[in-house]
Amino acid sequence: MGKDKKASGSGSGSKGGKDAGNKDAGKDAGKASKGAQSINVRHILCEKHGKKEEALAKIRDGADFGAVAREYSEDKARTGGSLGWKQKGTLDPEFEKVAFALETSSTSSPKIGEVKTQFGYHIIMVEGKK
């Protein structure tokens, strides 16, 4: 009889574990689909790591992101690094992964992310999400 009780207990425990796993999987899937589908993004693109580090130091010292972009970026410099509104799936995958994970912020107090892509070194900030 002891063996029967263990078998029943294990069966119930396993079944409960599977149910809990399915519920969690459903919640995670729901969260993924509810995330932002587009972002208003700016970046500073530098071919050389050293130049990216100089730009990063200026931002960390309190310089305006747009001003640093105009001085250092090798792409979109005239627009302060603005790429405008971009939808998920339209950017370089590595860039997109970092950009969509960032919190929104302003050019005067940016929350930044960094990534290296085939294009070079990027410093990224996001101004809006929808």
Curated annotation (Swiss-Prot):
One of its GO terms (biological process) is rRNA processing. PROSITE patterns: PPIC_PPIASE_2 (PS50198). Residues 16-31 have a biased composition (Basic and acidic residues). It catalyses: [protein]-peptidylproline (omega=180) = [protein]-peptidylproline (omega=0). Gene3D superfamilies: 3.10.50.40. Keywords: Isomerase, Rotamase. GO terms for molecular function: DNA binding; peptidyl-prolyl cis-trans isomerase activity. One of its GO terms (cellular component) is nucleus. Its EC number is 5.2.1.8. Pfam families: Rotamase_3 (PF13616). It comes from the Eukaryota. SUPFAM superfamilies: FKBP-like. Residues 1-38 are annotated as: Disordered. PPIases accelerate the folding of proteins. It catalyzes the cis-trans isomerization of proline imidic peptide bonds in oligopeptides. This is Peptidyl-prolyl cis-trans isomerase pin4. The gene is ppi-5.
